[in-house]
Amino acid sequence: MPMFEDSEGDGGAVLSFDERRGDDGEAYQSLNGTDGPADENHGREEGGRGRGGGRRGPDGAILRAPRGRGKVQVLPEENSLPPDDPFADDGPGEGRSGGQNRGNRFRGGQQRPAPGGRLPQRGGNGAARGGAMEPGRGPRPGPAAGLRRSPYGGLGFWEKIQSEAALDAARAEFFSGATPMDLQEIQNLSGEQMAELAASLEMDWEPSLRPQLVENCLRRAAEGRTAIAASGTLELLSDGNGCLVWARDRFEPSQWSPFVPRCLIRRHGLRRGQELRLLTTFPRANGPHLCALGLEQVMGQNPGEAAKIPQFKELIPYYPTERLLLENGAEEAGQRLSLRIVDLVSPIGLGQRGLIVAPPRTGKTVLLQAFANAIAAVRPDAQVWILLIDERPEEVTDFRRMARGEVFASTFDETPDRHVRLAEMVIEMARRRVECGQHVVILLDSITRLARAYNAVMPASGRIMSGGIDANALQGPKSFFGSARNIEGGGTLTILATALVETGSRMDDVIFEEFKGTGNMELQLDRDLADRRIYPAINVARSGTRKEELLYHPDELSRIYLFRRAVVGLNSAEAVDMLIQRVKKTSTNVEFLMTLNRG
């Protein structure tokens, strides 16, 4: 057994070093002191592939022998990455996982010290042999709810982005003041323009080489100290940092998603879902990711002005007061008939929180497309978004072709986690725009499937409701749906969501009952009417809007009450059939209401 002296320890104690191999063939060291007790947390490890021993010197540093023969090395106490490689990728998941042994080694084979200077345990949870947790420590907490783990490895520990002063110095070092190169312009170049760019860079051009050509162009700009301007939506990560994402990638981090350090986020009070324009660069010549060092715009405004925007929860909500006359925006005769009846039965205003109760095959898809086209026509200043969750792929294609508005979709062959992340990003983007005084309309299909996705990804609370849904699973969908509101003196967020009923699933019925009283407008579709091929299959008696007097003209309201009293004694089929026949005889709803007193 080779022997060596502890030159860094106390009193020159003699330590013995032995290298052996475990059952899995991996080499491990046994470090034993001839005097003084060994550190109990490093003497034996649970769930490990080997055993190690150690002791501490007079300054409290851990003494550990390297592989092979030699003197004991003193590992640093700092909880940081080595200065020569601050961008090492720790593999999938969060960059600093304290339990994985192989993912916590530096290039030289040394283990990365955990917080407080201790080496991480191979068992993964810091427990000793008896299963007792080390005093004052516990399992590493998981990521914040709704936030993804960082895919950027150790980039967040780069010393040049750890403080505002360091960030200012980094901008002076990496940027020369020349006009920035726009990332989106390079990515959107046509084939001919890409061929010209390839010739200027002395590269061969083929369509399959577009990513390599874009990368070479950006790296040359970075080498010349030219900033790379990138515009996108801010996504926050579980470690407090962020990145830019785009709708074309369904808000998933891509190869060109710039890293946004937490220092920049805190300095300007950035929020998830904000539209940013950043100045970025490659931190090193062969670094895989862009890193943001400067901020030019937030939601199209100066960063200083954007920081004064109040948060969404601080805004004062009120009932909708500005009506959307859908009949004026109808493009087809069939859509016009449906929209005229909706205007009569359950009017919609800016800031409405509406629930469309729809059994299967009752025409909800056609109705949503009609809503999108009409709202886009009557209110061009409103942004119309269509959010499809757990939907069929062909249905997504049909919406993109037939409806006016931006479509965000997550199809049924994707994971529930993807459904939840997409929905949360869309609602955060909508909130940021409402804070700026803009109008946003979200058509959601469906809130039932969104609640199912939340039920699948939420940790089990142990409290199960009827139908198998967790008691905490509906908090996320309620937060989404409850964001719809009319802001006094500001913007509006309108959400019209479909709720599935009569599907044969008890869970779907429970979800509908939970959302039944949360909206201020309800439009019920009738399966019996659809089976008789009576469209629109709207149940007139069970549909309506709260505070409808704020949307109707007083003269119009009295005629609406007269119409309501006339259909009270009729069943659903008779009421809607009579309404359809009377509406078809007139060209506008005003003309229809004027004929009511004539019988």
Identify what each model region corresponds to.
Residues 194, 213, 242, 261, ...:
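Residue-level signature of catalytic and energy-coupling elements of molecular machines
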Residues 270-272, 281-356:
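P-loop NTP-binding catalytic core
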Residues 101-106, 111, 134, 196-306:
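N-terminal "pre-motor" subdomain/linker immediately upstream of P-loop NTPase catalytic cores
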Residues 166-192, 239, 292-298, 307-312:
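N-terminal intrinsically disordered, low-complexity tails of helicases
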Residues 157-185, 217, 228-229, 303-306, ...:
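RNA-contacting regions in translation and RNA-metabolism proteins
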Residues 217, 236-238, 246-248, 280, ...:
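Flexible glycine-/small-residue-rich
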